[in-house]
Amino acid sequence: MATLHAPAFELPEILNTKTNLADARIGAQVIECSDDFFAEAKRMLQFEAPIFVEDKFDDHGKWMDGWESRRKRHAGYDWCIVKLGVSGKISALDIDTTFFTGNYPASASLEACYAPNGDLTGVTWQSILENTELGPSQHHIFMVNNDAIFTHIRLNIFPDGGIARLRVYGDVHIQVTDHEQTLDLLALENGGRVIAYSDAHFGHPRNLINPGRGVNMGDGWETKRRRAPGYDWCILALGKSGKIEKIEIDTAHFKGNFPAEVSIQAVYLENATDAQLIPQSMFWSYLLEAQPMQMDHIHEYMNEILQHEKVSHIRINMIPDGGISRVRLWGKIAKS
């Protein structure tokens, strides 16, 4: 039973610093859907790229890795309501029909609403994607120009069919209710994002802020072997500025390729552009001076943290190269 994997897809550069708000790993979930007879709607929220398993069938027919409704035999269309993992401003959509060739929808539209208490009764749905034609087995990227904050989306497919994956890219909006609560201020679900990096040959630094521990060596940031003086680095923005109380650096699964040392520089800047941060980052003061690393280990630091009242951005230096799986910055959100 052969398994086909989705072709490699390069996300547009402008979206590399955005968060997929509809990622099941950060809590996105299907609330309601009109029909998912052939394939459960929740599959389209999975982080992993879709697969196609030849000759795999279940009681309802061909098994598909995505959401698929039955063939319509009356007027109308199918729809699915998704609660986003975190509320946020939506910048772009990726409606992916990979492996749906004779069963993709003719077109799709998408609406969004703001319902922080989860009650959708009487909410106003805003259209953020007008009804637009789709094609077979491909990514469809749509840019969104809307400054509103949303908590839920409704995907409409016309008249029926299947969607492999739905990605909703945007900026996380954290509603601060308790400034004394300790959070991982760098976490994906709390709005952390990657701004720039020196190298990502074997693994992207966005993996550093993923939920949970890394599942394998590919689920981390890993650079190529350095053949010149220097070291590798990446710059990240915290979801909210705050005072850091504890740092965790996890080298899970990195055994023959962990860095010799890791250091972290930090700064507090308001309204800084991403472009200005890159050349300035080399001059930021240290939050954590270079620390020796061990293989496949969670390194925890508290007393070693250098004084910073507020931190908004960090630069992680991996000396000289190698791979790390996760970085956590535990602290409290700064009062404005």
Swiss-Prot record:
InterPro entries: Allantoicase (IPR005164), Allantoicase_dom (IPR015908), Galactose-bd-like_sf (IPR008979)
Pathway involvement of the protein, from the record: Nitrogen metabolism; (S)-allantoin degradation; (S)-ureidoglycolate from allantoate (aminidohydrolase route): step 1/1
One record GO biological process: allantoin catabolic process
Keyword terms: Hydrolase, Purine metabolism
Catalytic reaction equation(s): allantoate + H2O = (S)-ureidoglycolate + urea
Keyword Hydrolase: yes
E.C. numbers: 3.5.3.4
Enzyme class, UniProt record, top EC level: hydrolase
Top-rank lineage group of the source organism: Bacteria
GO molecular function, one term: allantoicase activity
Record-linked NCBIfam families: allantoicase
UniProt record similarity statement: Belongs to the allantoicase family.
Name of the protein described by the UniProt record: Probable allantoicase
Organism: Acinetobacter baumannii (strain ACICU)
Gene symbol of the encoding locus: alc
